[in-house]
């Protein structure tokens, strides 16, 4: 293996050694072979990083900052046009690792332009981003949704767009992603034919919409074969996800997008994806915390596990299952919500005012519930969760309609020091009596009004 060196003071005619570094990352990428490492010296590199060579199994190509220094792949002054012109573009690249880099400053205000930090597609596999920071990736477009061209950007955009071979073995770990204006898009997107991924030990925060999404049937890969056009077999683990909220750019959401409620962003979201484990995450101050929801009329969100997460101080619901009411019919099926702690969510009322949905539901005066089941929830299990309601408007569990079937609920602990929110909804009917709730929902072996004796509430202040 060979070590290559790049420095902002280098020369592309140099040999690429430590004493004679190259100037551009692109030149180093043309020389690199499987097993080689490219070290970037301190400084900002204003270029698109587009590898054309791949590593091999056991012989990764690595691009990283020189030890003790910070290299930035920096879009300042660069032209960002259209979609998929990311600062780092991995098109069918394999066996490559990026470490200790900053990927930053890709912005544009034009319509139909999607600034991106990292774009991965094709038959890419065994790609790792480790200890990287991705920030200031922004669309400042002021076109609203009704104009047809609207605000969009991504920190990571991963699209499995090959119908035959999925993207495999993608890892994003120990990265920090923040300061994003993504409009109606998401911060970290895994979509299309992706089979096997891990997002772990990251921080995603201070972004104006969804934090992490695992998606299927998405318009980003509109031509995909529906049998494989969904991300699956992934793990989202030990991440800290916070302030993923329309409140980050309230002027856009309330003014341009005309959404006066402005509380629609989900921290961690599976939307038409499948077989994904969401575990040991901490999610706070998002509009909604964790969603197993489908915006698809074809693909359900299915066979996912949400376990051992800590969800608190979110504006609306803590954990959300089902469709958007009156909007889609894909639903949520075969999912498990177990061993989670939910505390003090629903700081504001719900989004439904009685006239903006086909079921004439109104939840804006109370709330969506710590756990929310909207439409078309089938064969899901909700067990062994600690549900601690605090605000006067809060609700332990809210199932909105009679749609769906065979959902199992039990072995939960429900507690609130405020008697006003000792309530549940099942099939749209409100219950304030625990026995009546159990009879209606089939809830078995849960505990009610037993103080869980949390060690400290200081974290919630």
Describe every region a protein language model picked out:
Residues 26, 30-37, 46-62, 72-99, ...:
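Extracellular beta-strand-rich solenoid/capping regions of secreted or surface-exposed proteins
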Residues 1-7:
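Boundary/junction segments of secreted and surface-exposed precursor proteins
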Residues 8-46, 437:
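Acidic Gly/Asp/Thr-rich repetitive segments characteristic of extracellular carbohydrate-active
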Residues 13, 36, 148, 345, ...:
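Acidic, glycine- and Ser/Thr-rich low-complexity intrinsically disordered tracts
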Residues 60, 66-69, 94-105, 125-140, ...:
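Right-handed parallel beta-helix
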Residues 45-51, 75-86, 107-116, 138-154, ...:
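Short glycine/acidic-rich loop motifs that flank beta-strands on beta-rich extracellular proteins
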């Amino acid at each position: 293996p060979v070590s290559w060196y790049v420095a902002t003071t280098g020369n592309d005619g140099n040999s690429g050694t430590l004493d004679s570094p190259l100037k551009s990352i692109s030149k180093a990428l043309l020389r690199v072979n499987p097993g080689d490492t490219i070290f970037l010296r301190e400084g900002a590199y204003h270029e698109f990083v587009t590898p054309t060579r791949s590593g091999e199994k056991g012989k990764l190509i690595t691009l990283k900052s020189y030890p003790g220094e910070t290299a930035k792949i920096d879009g300042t002054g660069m032209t960002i046009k259209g979609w998929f012109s990311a600062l780092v573009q991995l098109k069918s690249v394999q066996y490559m690792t990026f470490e200790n880099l900053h990927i930053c400053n890709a912005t544009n205000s034009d319509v139909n332009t999607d600034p991106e930090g990292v774009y991965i597609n094709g038959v890419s596999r065994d790609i790792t981003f480790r200890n990287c920071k991705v920030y200031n990736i922004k669309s400042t477009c002021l076109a609203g949704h009704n104009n047809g061209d609207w605000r969009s950007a991504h920190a990571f955009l991963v699209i499995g767009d090959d119908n035959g071979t999925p993207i495999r073995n993608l890892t994003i770990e120990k990265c920090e992603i923040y300061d994003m204006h993504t409009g109606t898009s998401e911060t970290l997107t895994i979509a299309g034919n992706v089979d096997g991924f891990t997002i772990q030990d990251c921080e995603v925060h201070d972004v104006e919409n969804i934090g992490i999404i695992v998606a299927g049937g998405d318009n980003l890969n509109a031509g995909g074969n529906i049998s494989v056009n969904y991300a699956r077999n992934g793990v989202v683990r030990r991440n800290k996800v916070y302030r993923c909220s329309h409140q980050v750019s309230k002027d856009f959401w309330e003014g341009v997008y005309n959404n006066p409620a402005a509380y629609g962003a989900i921290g961690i979201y599976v939307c038409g994806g499948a077989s994904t484990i969401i575990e040991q995450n901490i999610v706070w101050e998002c509009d909604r915390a964790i969603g197993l929801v489908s915006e698809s009329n074809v693909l359900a969100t299915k066979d996912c596990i949400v376990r051992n997460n800590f969800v608190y101080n979110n504006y609306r619901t803590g954990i959300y299952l089902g469709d958007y009411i009156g909007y889609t019919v894909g639903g949520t099926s075969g999912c498990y919500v177990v061993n989670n702690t939910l505390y003090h969510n629903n700081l504001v009322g719900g989004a439904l005012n009685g006239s903006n949905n086909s079921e004439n539901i109104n939840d804006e005066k109370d709330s969506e519930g710590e756990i929310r089941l909207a439409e078309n929830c089938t064969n899901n299990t909700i067990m062994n969760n600690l549900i601690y309601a605090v605000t006067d408007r809060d609700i332990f569990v809210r199932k909105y309609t009679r749609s769906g079937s065979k959902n199992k609920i039990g072995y939960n602990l429900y507690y609130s020091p405020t008697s006003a929110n000792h309530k549940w909804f099942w099939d749209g009917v409100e219950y304030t009596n625990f026995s009546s709730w159990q009879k209606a929902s089939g809830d078995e072996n849960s505990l009610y009004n037993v103080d869980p004796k949390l060690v400290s509430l200081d974290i919630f202040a």
